[in-house]
Amino acid sequence: MKNKIKIRLKSFDHRSLDQATKEIVSAVKRTFANINGPIPLPRKIERFTVNRSPHVHKKSREQFEIRKHKRLLVIDDPNPAVVDALSKVDLAAGVDVVIELESGE
C-alpha cells in the first residue's frame, strides 16, 4: 500500500510562492521523507480590458492582467513525522495551500 501527499501551492507572486516551496521542501527533507518537486504547473493569465472613460471615447481602453502561479509537491509514503512537520510550517500570507492525501491500494 503506497500513500502519497500532494501539495498544490498557488499565488499571485512567484517570489513568495518559491519561498513557501523552499520552506516546505526543507521541512520534509528534515524528516528524511522522499519528496518529488517542486513541479511548476502552467501559470494562468487573466486579462481584463476596460474603458478609460465612463461615457464616450470607446477606443481609449486600459488593460489589466492577473497572473496565477502554481507549484506541485508530491511526498511518497509519508510518515507521521512528515505530517507533524507540515503542520508546523509557517507560510506567507499570499500563498494558498491545498493538501490531498492519495492512498494507493
From Swiss-Prot:
Instruction: Report which superkingdom the organism of origin falls in.
Output: Bacteria
SUPFAM superfamilies on file? Ribosomal protein S10
One GO term under biological process is: translation
- Does the keyword Ribonucleoprotein feature in the UniProt annotation? yes
User: A cellular component term (GO) from this record?
Assistant: ribosome
Q: Which UniProt keywords apply?
A: Ribonucleoprotein, Ribosomal protein
- InterPro entries, alphabetized: Ribosomal_uS10 (IPR001848), Ribosomal_uS10_dom (IPR027486), Ribosomal_uS10_dom_sf (IPR036838)
| Oligomeric form and interacting partners | Part of the 30S ribosomal subunit.
Q: What's this chain's function?
A: Involved in the binding of tRNA to the ribosomes.
For this chain, the family text in UniProt reads: Belongs to the universal ribosomal protein uS10 family.
The protein's name in its UniProt record: Small ribosomal subunit protein uS10
Q: Which gene encodes it?
A: rpsJ
